[in-house]
């Protein structure tokens, strides 16, 4: 997005408070850069471990671009709440039974944060915080400033969840797998109760927390969305009308990273599993749009037998691939033993790379050799694929990912399903076992990747492969235009700043 210099008299001080999870941190750091490029001061409030994940990119933004982004770190009182030592992120939480304790511990950040804000020469103007951090609503009231909610979801999924919660159609079906239409949607969308986000699942010790989240969101000034209006026509307007609040589309926020170093480091936890050189050498050696990138997200906890089916499918497909493996430590040990015993990496050498841990996802997706993305349908991954024109194989796991799959496959027509029908929620991995077999993996890969750019008649309108790739390339162009000067998202950022200024003038 274009930088703008605003007068010091009108400089705003945005306080960004992301949830302590990788998928929530990454877009909030991008938003901090977008706001700072408009001449504003930005303070990111987080914990020491989480701050280390984006230290490099924020340091570059300060030193090389002169952006005024400050990072304030407060430790979580993990001992007080019976959490494991240094447990500062949802990624490292060993059990969902500790989820309530984690939220209670995070709640304790309110007091030291408010003391810090009281001491600032330039007082806070606006809080942008994750929907889960309901206590930030109290802070906003205390400082008499607006609070804006960040969900990390697209408007399609936000509207779907809102309308299901409002009308409760999921309660009228006879079974958890019976599909029902979601009311109030621009397209006819059907989903099963089992596929709904976890917020619709009963969790006795979290129900009051969820209610506080909903209540604090109802008091918010508005909602900021990492998407762009051209991607979700009809859904943007319908969602704003449904919640009767301001909604600002400021994405795709990942496009604020225009340096290769930022693309490589984006979201890194410091445990680099592959070097930039090794990754680029592999991609540079492949034909355009021939490589399948495979990553099921930072919270993937699939069992070894399921991951083995995925690996065997990748091998049998015959396509070049980069396979990122993330799972629980005990599962990783077992899977690593299988990889060594079966000599898997040697069998696919020259055609496939296995990355055990963090990978430079944005850099890989942006490379011209990447032609497909097997994804869990998390929104960050989905919109990054759209930005770089990479069609998807959808393998949703939990949260709103089945809704995102509907958008990808049924509305936008830029992906194919691997065929998973039920979620793998935290703690259910062993009970559910293997849900996707090798043949389904191979079939989905062939549907997405079999015809590459050198063997397709681009004038064949009846070819689904051509239509899918043409459509996502069109969306990639729209995404880049949205964040350019006078683009829809760039304009939305300016409107957001003006709206906050006007809100402050009313106090």
From Swiss-Prot:
Signal peptide: none
Molecular function, one GO term: UDP-glucosyltransferase activity
Residues annotated as binding UDP-alpha-D-glucose: 298, 359-361, 376-384, 398-401
Disulfide partners: none
EC assignment: 2.4.1.-
Coiled-coil portions: none
Keywords: Glycosyltransferase, Transferase
Record-given protein name: UDP-glycosyltransferase 73D1
